[in-house]
């Protein structure tokens, strides 16, 4: 059963176990989460020089939007303050900083009504993160920078929890993605030509769920959940933040969520850094985790 829990009184070990069972965790805005959102808003305002960045797509050509959004996303990811703010969030959430690792945080920019659906504004089709070579032990943290409405959020498909769906993950290799796919994001025009892993059969939307969150409200879910960018018909660009965490203890024990239909190659584990000092995951842990993805 895919339960939704709001601000649960759980230890971090208990929280991870619930997420590995397919549950969703919602966190109310806290000072560290609000600080991360404020940091992102400052960068967004600087990039677009606009009092209302959510509607800027209506005032500039898409080529200019790409030229502004691409560097913005890179600055957010690589800014040392971004990583420090993520660490503050993990401290408040009860994570052990010596055994918790997180990957580079990302600022997502999802425009409205087909203005930009590729490259830096890619609207993700239904997928599991494990299809992109993520480990079963990965947990996803997702929060909007501005308040959302139903036509501006994510779609979750909990009916596929532990149930396979035909997909093209066997054609995905993470090393190739790093070499070609990610670096070519700003070169994508109206059609995204990168090799994304996708369903090869129709997704049953009978159990679709959408979380309509306020700014800094945060959704936690397993990397094994099937999810997608909901079609944005709001007239407003959606800005959101996501990052992923793993516990070294889970990699060692083999703990994680079901992974019923993943055939991707490679591993994202080398992207993760330790929360305490931002050092990379040791190679022996990468090898151990990769064998279990």
Give residue spans per PLM region.
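N-terminal auxiliary "cap/dimerization" subdomain that precedes the catalytic jelly-roll/cupin core
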Residues: 1-94, 285-292
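Elongated scaffolding segments in large macromolecular assemblies
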Residues: 19-20, 28-48, 212-220, 224, ...
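Short, solvent-exposed loop/turn segments at secondary-structure junctions
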Residues: 32-33, 114, 147-148, 161-162, ...
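Short, cationic low-complexity segments
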Residues: 54, 161-179, 261-281
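Conserved double-stranded beta-helix
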Residues: 88-162
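Generic recognition of flexible, low-complexity loop/linker segments
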Residues: 129, 207-209, 227-231
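Double-stranded beta-helix
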Residues: 151-221
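Non-heme Fe(II)/2-oxoglutarate
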Residues: 225-293
């Amino acid at each position: 059963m895919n339960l939704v829990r709001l601000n649960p009184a759980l230890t971090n070990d208990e929280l991870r176990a619930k997420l590995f069972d397919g549950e969703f965790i919602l966190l109310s805005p806290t000072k560290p989460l609000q600080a991360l959102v404020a940091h992102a808003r400052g960068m967004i305002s600087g990039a677009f020089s606009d009092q209302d960045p959510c509607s800027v797509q209506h005032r500039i050509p898409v080529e200019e939007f790409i030229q502004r959004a691409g560097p913005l996303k890179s600055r957010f990811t690589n800014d040392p303050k971004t990583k420090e703010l993520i660490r503050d969030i993990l401290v408040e959430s009860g994570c052990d900083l010596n055994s918790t690792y997180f990957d580079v945080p990302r600022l997502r920019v999802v425009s409205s009504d087909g203005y930009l659906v590729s490259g830096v504004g890619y609207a993700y089709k239904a997928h599991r993160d494990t299809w992109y070579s993520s480990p079963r032990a990965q947990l996803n943290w997702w929060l909007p920078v501005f308040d959302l409405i139903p036509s501006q959020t994510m779609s979750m498909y909990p009916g596929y929890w532990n149930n396979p769906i035909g997909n093209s993950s066997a054609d995905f290799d993470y090393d190739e993605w790093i070499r070609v796919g990610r670096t070519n994001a700003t070169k994508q025009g109206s059609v995204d030509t990168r090799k994304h892993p996708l369903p090869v059969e129709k997704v049953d939307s009978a159990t679709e769920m959408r979380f309509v969150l306020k700014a800094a409200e945060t959704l936690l879910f397993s990397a094994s959940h099937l999810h997608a960018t909901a079609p944005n018909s709001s007239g407003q660009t959606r800005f959101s933040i996501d990052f992923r965490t793993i516990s070294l203890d889970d990699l060692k024990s083999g703990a994680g969520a079901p992974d019923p239909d993943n055939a991707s190659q490679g591993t994202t584990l080398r992207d993760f850094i330790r929360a305490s000092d931002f050092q990379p995951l040791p190679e022996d842990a990468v090898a151990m985790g990769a064998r279990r993805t």
